[in-house]
Amino acid sequence: MSKSTAEIRQAFLDFFHSKGHQVVASSSLVPNNDPTLLFTNAGMNQFKDVFLGLDKRNYSRATTSQRCVRAGGKHNDLENVGYTARHHTFFEMLGNFSFGDYFKHDAIQFAWELLTGENWFALPKERLWVTVYETDDETYEIWEKEVGIPRERIIRIGDNKGAPYASDNFWQMGDTGPCGPCTEIFYDHGDHIWGGPPGSPEEDGDRYIEIWNIVFMQFNRQADGTMEPLPKPSVDTGMGLERIAAVLQHVNSNYDIDLFRTLIEAVAKVTGATDLGNKSLRVIADHIRSCAFLVADGVLPSNENRGYVLRRIIRRAVRHGNMLGAKETFFYKLVGPLIEVMGSAGEELKRQQAQVEQVLKTEEEQFARTLERGLALLDEELAKLQGDTLDGETAFRLYDTYGFPVDLTADVCRERNIKVDEVGFEAAMEEQRRRAREASGFGADYNAMIRVDSASEFKGYDHLELNGKVTALFVDGKAVEAINAGQEAVVVLDQTPFYAESGGQVGDKGELKGAGFTFAVDDTQKYGQAIGHIGKLSAGALKVGDAVQADVDEARRARIRLNHSATHLMHAALRQVLGTHVAQKGSLVSDKVLRFDFSHNEAMKPSEIRQVEDLVNAQIRRNLPIETNIMDLDAAKAKGAMALFGEKYDERVRVLSMGDFSTELCGGTHASRTGDIGLFRIISESGTAAGIRRIEAVTGEGAMATVHAQSDRLNDIAHLLKGDSQNLGDKVRAVLERTRQLEKELQQLKDQAAAQESANLSSKAVDLNGVKLLVSELAGIEPKMLRTMVDDLKNQLVSTVIVLATVVEGKVSLIAGVSKDVTDRVKAGELIGMVAQQVGGKGGGRPDMAQAGGTDAAALPAALASVQGWVSAKLQ
């Protein structure tokens, strides 16, 4: 009879306790020693300072069953949960740890004894495979010579795309922190399940499943990527309880283990569902674990950070309950069954059961009030959707009005093969996200933490010079009374002509001057109702209360004004040319360029770009007056003024009009007349996300500089082609036609050379038990020609095994071909994998044809020499 999940957990802890390990309780899901982590996501999190040598324990060996959550940040599994066999928001990580005590030898021996020992897990040894980091020869030898695993079941895994330490077998908790090479143990479910061993093209299948990762902690990765040796080499291992339970209980999905079967039955009972195979049951069974334990560890639903992740998970579960037909609140009713199935690991949850149930019930009730209306709105929007992408505005409205996290909306859409414009959603959420970052301190910079009680009056519409008084000073985010020469600071004035970054327009630059001091302003930002001048005091001293003369960089402001006015003209022109579906999704207005993101489902045609340019320049030539009026928001909208989605407006708004061509709400600075812009020129059009296009353009002197540069390039090309700009098109077409002809002739010559080379090679084949074996390294042959040559040789040699290789710029290209009558004994994929491994690469393919690459050209001769022996053994 197989062990229950609770028994497996206890057996793991008992085994390592018998090996001198201290059994340490699971730490909270909220890390208390690592501000870089949203949630505890690995067993070693609570020991991070021990690995770094910053904390001392009265034991050097430890074992745990650690509660973990992966539903936000780098390790985000949420969208896959319920749809795959092994993704979870919550899981338990079984682990054993050595803090400068034992290292590779003992760690591997312990793992092998627990997995295969008759008194423990008793797994068949022949079902276990292992991987090691490519250069970790010591670990390889322990597995081969001491444990006795055959070489063919020990796989070296190198760096991804040559990036140092970017490997599945070089473990790191995050971008910084403890790390080191690791060895992973895989269980082979058998050939009745599709999939290949790790490192093979079929490795994503379900046949070979990773069950244990043993990390040899040797380094501390710094922010700049350097590796510093840890004080003492240590060991950190992790084995997912749910995965090993699936193996020991002889099931292929984690959701089929006893723990999840019990929870799924409980979910079916409280929702009234009858089909126990419904994926929504799996989603809810997973989500009750993460939600209940997060609440028990002090996380409450909110719109910020950890609380928002919890809210997302709860609401995803409630929505799946709705899909199952649940007519009343159900989610909180699963806490009791969860406590029962968790056994000893649920004791803390049991103590807080009433509170956890109340929190979950309240959140579910709040969401249930808007869920049906939100789903109805979403159904309505999807029904009239023209393309395959839901716009960000609708996604934001679902969030803002009905409490739909965007990934819940994405879940609904994914079931109908529809994407969500998350860029548009993020644009609408930007202000809320900024406030959340400031409040949490996660990644906040010093200036973002500034709080100013006073307000600044902006007078920059009419003045570029103004006298003001210093009302506050900040250095590194902290309020100070004075600053001295050389210090960087934020200066707040009672009134200022400096425009603070807003609505896409960059902040002004300039100077603050006074008695004996000069402060160079590099940027201007808003801090609540205050305007902060960011820069450096270049001379003198400055203190709160000082009088200053504020001088805006006039030439820079003038260029910004032209670009901002041109942005409005372009917005209106885009709506005329492309349609009224065009809506602003983001913008940047600087002194050098204007950038405009807008909703549109396809790339603009050259003719459309020209139309927009022509329309804007026509309005510039009309020299329309640019007028501003202050009016009520409702009146402005009634007048047809366009408001930007995501922007928050006061009841009284500033309406900017350019004749009858453009009317928008805008607080930015602008030209006096459209003619001031001079010239408008689009320099690029591109896509930034699904349904979002981006235009970059220049105006005035910048536009003239672009025209001159293009003219110069055309003249240079004409000179190279020995023509002039008038007949440049004909010259280029002639060159391209000649190039195509030469390329065609060259390819014909290459084909002839390859055919001749194939004919020459066929005579070099050797006979192995009636099968022709041909192995050759070819010089001067393009990699793509190898496949053609293999096809030719297979036709010539009939029953054959072929391996060809070439080296181009130090990179090895390999191909193996096997005639179909031989594939029952020799498979091209296995053969090419054996050769590729020796030259620092990997590859795969079909039984009759496989390709690979490698980086170690020096090892190629020896690798090719090994083919005959390998093939001979297969043909025996």
From Swiss-Prot:
It is found in: Cytoplasm. One of its GO terms (biological process) is negative regulation of DNA-templated transcription. GO terms for cellular component: cytosol. Binds 1 zinc ion per subunit. HAMAP family: Ala_tRNA_synth_B. Catalyzes the attachment of alanine to tRNA(Ala) in a two-step reaction: alanine is first activated by ATP to form Ala-AMP and then transferred to the acceptor end of tRNA(Ala). Also edits incorrectly charged Ser-tRNA(Ala) and Gly-tRNA(Ala) via its editing domain. Consists of three domains; the N-terminal catalytic domain, the editing domain and the C-terminal C-Ala domain. The editing domain removes incorrectly charged amino acids, while the C-Ala domain, along with tRNA(Ala), serves as a bridge to cooperatively bring together the editing and aminoacylation centers thus stimulating deacylation of misacylated tRNAs. This is Alanine--tRNA ligase. It comes from Salmonella paratyphi A (strain ATCC 9150 / SARB42).
